């Protein structure tokens, strides 16, 4: 720490390089450093730690201008002197913005893990349940992340297998297998249990039925996740927008829509770069 000039995230480093001055961060990245996003300040308990507080950045809302683009970059890219540099956000928040989700709607990311976020009027923080909130404008993204997800499918199936078994599934007839798919022991949300073991038995002889059972299990975890968020004070989603590799599976979306009794759609846009561009456009107007 004696040789450090700033405490920063990767996004903060890029921000500093672009505007020629370091020492700024956005509220979404700063949350990971312990920033109090409700009171919008660094908490008092940081004073009890052996941390030079002058290293901590000045925190601003995501999308807020922090300065002009530095002259070397303006010259290199042929941009005007009026070009502003805006505070960024985390990749997951940018992906949420990219979907165009509205207040009360949720985004489920079906990647290697299962990540849920719902846009709410009030924040929810329940670390014992793996639940946290990111500030986004005058609203909040309340969410949690399960260890379940596509990583489990990859342990058993190739892309060709998934395509073939999806066509063979009979989603009108649930398997009743009651799986809790995990890639390894341990879960964090909606059940916070480091000792929770995967439940993938019994395994039927029919691989398509086994595949369907795993999808049903992940869908059930998603359902319980939104129930957990609602029990803690978040709204029940009016719609679930899906991102990640599992978003394109229409049969899975239908299964999840029936279980949650709300529309489940695939996101038209989900790239973090697109969401960041939308954030910048809003912040610069």
Regions from the language model: what does each represent?
Residues 1-10, 15-21, 32-50, 71-241, ...:
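Active-site core segments that coordinate phosphate-bearing ligands/cofactors
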Residues 24-29:
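Nucleotide/phosphate-binding loop and acidic/charged catalytic motifs
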Residues 38, 62-69:
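Short beta-strand to alpha-helix junction loop
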Residues 48-64:
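A conserved helix-loop-beta module that forms one wall/lid of the active-site cleft
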């Amino acid at each position: 720490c004696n040789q450090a000039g700033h405490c920063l995230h990767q996004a903060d480093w890029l921000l500093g390089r672009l505007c020629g001055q370091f020492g700024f961060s956005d509220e979404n990245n700063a949350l990971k450093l312990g920033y109090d996003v409700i009171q919008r300040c660094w908490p008092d308990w940081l004073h009890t730690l052996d941390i030079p507080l002058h290293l901590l950045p000045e925190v601003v809302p995501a999308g807020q201008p922090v300065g002009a683009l530095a002259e070397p970059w303006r010259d290199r890219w042929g941009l005007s002197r009026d070009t502003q540099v805006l505070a960024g956000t985390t990749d997951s928040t940018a992906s949420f913005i990219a979907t165009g989700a509205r207040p009360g709607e949720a985004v489920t990311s079906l990647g290697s893990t299962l990540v849920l976020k719902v846009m709410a009027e009030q924040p929810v923080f329940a670390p014992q349940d793996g639940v946290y909130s990111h500030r986004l404008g005058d609203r909040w993204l309340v969410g949690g992340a399960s260890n379940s997800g596509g990583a489990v499918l990859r342990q058993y199936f190739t892309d060709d297998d998934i395509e073939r078994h999806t066509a063979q599934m009979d989603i009108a007839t649930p398997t009743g297998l009651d799986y809790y798919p995990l890639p390894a022991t341990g879960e964090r949300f909606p059940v916070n249990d480091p000792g929770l073991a995967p439940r993938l038995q019994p395994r039927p002889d029919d691989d398509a039925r086994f595949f369907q059972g795993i999808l049903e299990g992940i869908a059930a975890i998603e359902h319980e996740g939104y129930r957990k968020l609602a029990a803690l004070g978040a709204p029940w989603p009016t719609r679930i927008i899906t991102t990640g590799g599992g978003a394109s599976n229409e049969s899975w979306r239908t299964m999840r829509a029936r279980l949650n009794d709300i529309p489940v759609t695939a996101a038209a846009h989900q790239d973090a770069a697109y969401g960041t561009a939308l954030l910048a456009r809003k912040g610069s107007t």
